[in-house]
């Protein structure tokens, strides 16, 4: 298959699934297997196109991101600030640094991914069932305690297949944060976390990068960026109506497909 076509297919899958609670890792592994793109080059490619998805968040939430560093203000009252982000980053950041190699060795495999797809779906159903009325209906109403709780749930995203947005939005619901506010906080929180993780992976895989792959990487990056932009905007509109439950059932179906096609 031509590199440009691989770039478009994989970039579209990455952009569509990175910020939906369905596990981008599971979809990328399955798609790569189906089109025969699952070698060492594919692993570096996934890191590069993930940066395209991150750029989409930066473009959509640029006013928020500027306000976090003291440039501009989105509201006259109390608002989300940099400390909210730092607090949310600490749990997964510490865990990721301490156990990065162990996580890569133990959890990056077909079996663990299938288990996490199911476990993540169960968590989402439980969160919907037992969540109480929201005390933080908007992003600016999130407390430091709620930010830390969401950060704790983000640790689950270190397990491939669990889904960053699925785990953090579920944590937000259990901490009495509304669906939309939890999702927006999740996306903003993902920027520093994903940049750090992707940067680390790129450094470790630097010797695999080649100028011969520029077309592949560029096509995938641009496709992931465009599709992620559309996916994020659509998901935020959809979330207020359909909640997490349909995504949970989809994860169960994906786990079955993954089991029969990959394992």
Swiss-Prot record:
Catalysed reactions listed for this entry: di-trans,octa-cis-undecaprenyl diphosphate + H2O = di-trans,octa-cis-undecaprenyl phosphate + phosphate + H(+)
GO BP: any one term: cell wall organization
Keyword Membrane set for record: yes
EC number: 3.6.1.27
Gene Ontology annotations for the cellular component aspect, listed alphabetically: plasma membrane
Keyword check for Cell membrane: yes
GO molecular function: undecaprenyl-diphosphatase activity
Residue intervals passing through the bilayer: 15-37, 42-62, 83-103, 106-126, 142-162, 183-203, 216-236, 242-262
Compartment annotation: Cell membrane
InterPro entries: UppP (IPR003824)
UniProt keyword terms in alphabetical order: Antibiotic resistance, Cell membrane, Cell shape, Cell wall biogenesis/degradation, Hydrolase, Membrane, Peptidoglycan synthesis, Transmembrane, Transmembrane helix
Superkingdom in the source lineage: Bacteria
Membrane topology note: Multi-pass membrane protein
Top-rank EC class of the record's enzyme: hydrolase
Chain's role: Catalyzes the dephosphorylation of undecaprenyl diphosphate (UPP). Confers resistance to bacitracin.
PANTHER family noted in UniProt: UNDECAPRENYL-DIPHOSPHATASE
Miscellaneous comment: Bacitracin is thought to be involved in the inhibition of peptidoglycan synthesis by sequestering undecaprenyl diphosphate, thereby reducing the pool of lipid carrier available.
Family membership noted in the UniProt record: Belongs to the UppP family.
Protein name as annotated: Undecaprenyl-diphosphatase 3
Species annotation: Bacillus thuringiensis subsp. konkukian (strain 97-27)
